[in-house]
């Protein structure tokens, strides 16, 4: 009886959310257009767009998008995030992951704003056009000179007090396993001497993914709309700076893999 009542309440809540879309969707479209215009103008006249305004605009847009999708972000261990610039290292299961993390950082008090490292192929999508508002770093993995230049850009962002997130698997991994971590993703933490925060995302796999791709990967979409963001214990630079980056990447991979397996079972 209790389960039936809970299911009914969830149904009612979702129904009310769908009903509210009549009002919310036009607002979202207007906010999206405004953000795209701001992103284009920011490239031309950056001095007119201070960070606090840009990050807040993106956070509000993302929050509304997740509301429309019916996604609830649950944060675990927020006290593990240092109140300063860090390198966030996360697993990657969905195109929704960056939005989930923007929401998680935006609603966690005292933590720095967050931006991302992304592959250059994504920079012309509507989502990552907006990400330019938060200084997303695009890298061309086929161009060594551009990658070297982007490393300086990453360090500059961290020096400005912004947290930087990287997905060291390099792509979305549609599997119940965590893909191999590439050690080069940690290089900026060594150069900028900042903490590494391992972060585990659970529940996002298959969201914003085509059925064809899911069938090809032979996996099912995560059920439900509750997505957990687990902040693991940060690693201070003094504890990894003299250690080979591949060993550090392996240790971070192990911790995220264990956390992912644990929360998938709960």
UniProtKB/Swiss-Prot annotation:
Function per UniProt: Converts lysophosphatidic acid (LPA) into phosphatidic acid by incorporating acyl moiety at the 2 position.
Originating organism: Mycoplasma pneumoniae (strain ATCC 29342 / M129 / Subtype 1) (Mycoplasmoides pneumoniae)
Annotated SMART domains: PlsC
Name of the gene: plsC
Motif stretch (HXXXXD motif): 92-97
Pfam families, alphabetized: Acyltransferase
Name of the featured protein: Probable 1-acyl-sn-glycerol-3-phosphate acyltransferase
NCBIfam families according to UniProt: AGP_acyltrn (TIGR00530)
The family this protein is said to belong to: Belongs to the 1-acyl-sn-glycerol-3-phosphate acyltransferase family.
Pathway recorded for this protein: Phospholipid metabolism; CDP-diacylglycerol biosynthesis; CDP-diacylglycerol from sn-glycerol 3-phosphate: step 2/3
A GO-annotated cellular component: membrane
GO BP: any one term: phosphatidic acid biosynthetic process
An annotated Gene Ontology molecular function: 1-acylglycerol-3-phosphate O-acyltransferase activity
Enzyme Commission number, as recorded: 2.3.1.51
Record bears the keyword Transferase: yes
Highest taxon above the source species: Bacteria
């Amino acid at each position: 009886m209790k389960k039936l009542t809970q299911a009914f309440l969830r149904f009612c809540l979702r129904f009310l959310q769908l009903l509210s879309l009549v009002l919310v969707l036009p607002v979202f479209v207007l906010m999206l257009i405004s953000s795209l215009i701001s992103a284009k103008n920011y490239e031309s006249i950056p001095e007119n767009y201070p960070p606090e305004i840009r990050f807040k605009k993106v956070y509000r847009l993302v929050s509304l998008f997740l509301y429309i999708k019916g996604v609830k972000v649950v944060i675990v261990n927020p006290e593990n995030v240092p109140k300063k610039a860090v390198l966030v290292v996360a697993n990657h299961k969905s195109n929704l992951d960056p939005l989930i993390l923007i929401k998680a950082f935006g609603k966690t008090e005292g933590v720095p704003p967050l931006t991302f490292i992304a592959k250059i192929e994504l920079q012309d999508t509507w989502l990552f056009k907006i990400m330019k508002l938060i200084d997303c770093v695009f890298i061309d993995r086929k161009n060594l000179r551009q990658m070297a230049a982007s490393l300086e850009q990453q360090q500059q962002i961290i020096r400005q007090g912004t947290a930087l997130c990287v997905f060291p698997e390099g792509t979305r991994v549609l599997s119940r396993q965590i893909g191999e971590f590439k050690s080069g993703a940690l290089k900026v933490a060594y150069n900028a001497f900042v903490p590494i925060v391992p972060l585990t995302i659970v529940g996002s796999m298959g969201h914003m993914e085509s059925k064809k791709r899911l069938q090809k990967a032979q996996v099912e979409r995560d059920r439900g709309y509750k997505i957990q963001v687990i902040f693991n214990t940060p690693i201070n630079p003094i504890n990894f700076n003299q250690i080979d980056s591949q060993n550090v990447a392996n240790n971070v991979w192990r911790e995220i893999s264990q956390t992912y397996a644990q929360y998938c079972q709960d």
